């Protein structure tokens, strides 16, 4: 049985309406190979993974907390108020944006890129939670209101 993304978005919307927030997305790290994946509406941590929590690693906030601005109806996300390094050994792997309707956008980054991305909220309003994952210092987040 396949479940459409519309099902997840509808379910997330219903959860958010009841709870008043963004509660659908969780981010997990594979314990064997270190890969990071997101999951929607997951109550159980997948086998071989652990759920990541924002800010659980002690590191420089100025290089890790996503900075979010709205420019020309787009969300510009820059990782850190001081630019984060993007080296082979230390870089930002992903930036996620979770909108109040439960929709999630993701940008994958690689060493050598700038630690930033521009997302199109497509007219969405409400609370937006932005996450980023540093391969050395874990998951970080910030929230804004659109």
For every predicted segment, state its role.
Residues 3, 7-14, 21:
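Short, positively charged and aromatic/hydrophobic N-terminal segments
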Residues 8, 21-51:
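Long, contiguous interaction/targeting segments characteristic
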Residues 37-74:
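Transition segment at domain starts
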Residues 79-87:
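Short amphipathic, basic-aromatic surface patches that mediate peripheral association
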Residues 91-101:
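Extended low-complexity, serine/threonine- and proline-enriched intrinsically disordered segments
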Residues 115-119:
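Short strand-edge motifs at loop-to-beta-strand transitions and within beta-strands
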Residues 121-126:
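Surface-exposed, short loops/turns at beta-strand junctions within beta-sandwich domains
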Residues 135-142:
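Short acidic/polar inter-strand loop motif in beta-rich domains
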């Amino acid at each position: 049985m396949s479940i459409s993304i519309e099902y997840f978005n509808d379910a997330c919307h219903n959860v958010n309406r009841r709870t008043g927030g963004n509660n659908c997305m969780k981010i997990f790290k594979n314990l064997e190979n270190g890969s990071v994946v997101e999951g929607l509406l997951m109550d159980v941590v997948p086998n071989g993974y652990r759920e990541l929590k924002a800010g659980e690693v002690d590191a420089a906030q100025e290089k890790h907390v996503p900075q979010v601005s709205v420019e020309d109806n787009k969300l510009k996300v820059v990782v850190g108020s001081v630019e984060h390094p993007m080296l082979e050994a230390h870089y930002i792997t992903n930036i996620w944006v979770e909108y109040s309707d439960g929709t999630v956008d993701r940008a994958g980054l690689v060493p050598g890129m700038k630690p930033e991305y521009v997302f199109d909220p497509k007219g969405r309003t409400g609370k937006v939670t932005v996450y980023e994952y540093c391969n050395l210092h874990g998951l970080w987040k910030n929230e804004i209101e659109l």
